[in-house]
């Protein structure tokens, strides 16, 4: 279940986000491809919204799309994101925003792998990452 909504003024967002995060998350910017630190991340864990911390994606659904941005074929739960039509830059796309704080995450396309056929193409700077803790148990 999605967490309670967070509402802040743009000045409040500016005070808690880096300039690059603010540009992407609040002004719907896009980071340069292959520049984000989480694009190359191969660790197991949970990807969260960088603005509010809501859990969004599992590393189990991350895949290499070759686009230069972290790509996932599914969200943790459909109530974690909202989808909006985006016709900017003379393109027809579907924007993905965090359902908790309304921050821009990226876009979703219908060219992903099975089982969903979707590719959530997400700006690395829009994400946080919580590494899966090693439980010390041996795999069976």
Swiss-Prot record:
It comes from Methanosarcina mazei (strain ATCC BAA-159 / DSM 3647 / Goe1 / Go1 / JCM 11833 / OCM 88). Its EC number is 1.8.4.12. It catalyses: L-methionyl-[protein] + [thioredoxin]-disulfide + H2O = L-methionyl-(R)-S-oxide-[protein] + [thioredoxin]-dithiol. Residues 10-132 form the MsrB domain. The active site is at residue 121. This is Peptide methionine sulfoxide reductase MsrB. GO terms for molecular function: peptide-methionine (R)-S-oxide reductase activity; zinc ion binding. Belongs to the MsrB Met sulfoxide reductase family. It is an enzyme of class 1 (oxidoreductase). Binds 1 zinc ion per subunit. The zinc ion is important for the structural integrity of the protein. InterPro entries: Met_Sox_Rdtase_MsrB, Met_Sox_Rdtase_MsrB_dom, Mss4-like_sf. Its cofactor is Zn(2+). PANTHER family: METHIONINE SULFOXIDE REDUCTASE, METHIONINE-R-SULFOXIDE REDUCTASE B1. The lineage of its organism: Archaea, Methanobacteriati, Methanobacteriota, Stenosarchaea group, Methanomicrobia. It comes from the Archaea. GO terms for cellular component: cytoplasm. One of its GO terms (biological process) is protein repair. Keywords: Metal-binding, Oxidoreductase, Zinc. Zn(2+) binds at residues 49, 52, 98, 101. PROSITE patterns: MSRB (PS51790). It holds the Pfam family SelR. Disulfide bonds: none annotated.
């Amino acid at each position: 279940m999605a967490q309670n909504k967070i509402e802040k003024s743009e000045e409040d967002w500016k005070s808690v986000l880096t300039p690059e995060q603010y540009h992407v998350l609040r002004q719907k910017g896009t980071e340069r491809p292959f520049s984000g630190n989480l694009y190359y991340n191969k660790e197991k864990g949970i990807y969260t919204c960088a603005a509010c911390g809501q859990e969004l994606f599992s590393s189990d659904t991350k895949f290499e799309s070759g686009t230069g941005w972290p790509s996932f074929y599914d969200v943790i739960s459909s109530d974690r994101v909202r989808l909006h039509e985006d016709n900017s830059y003379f393109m027809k796309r579907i924007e993905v925003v965090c359902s908790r704080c309304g921050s821009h995450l990226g876009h979703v396309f219908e060219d992903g792998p099975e089982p969903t056929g979707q590719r959530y193409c997400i700006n690395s700077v829009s994400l946080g990452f919580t590494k899966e803790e090693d439980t010390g148990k041996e795999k069976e």
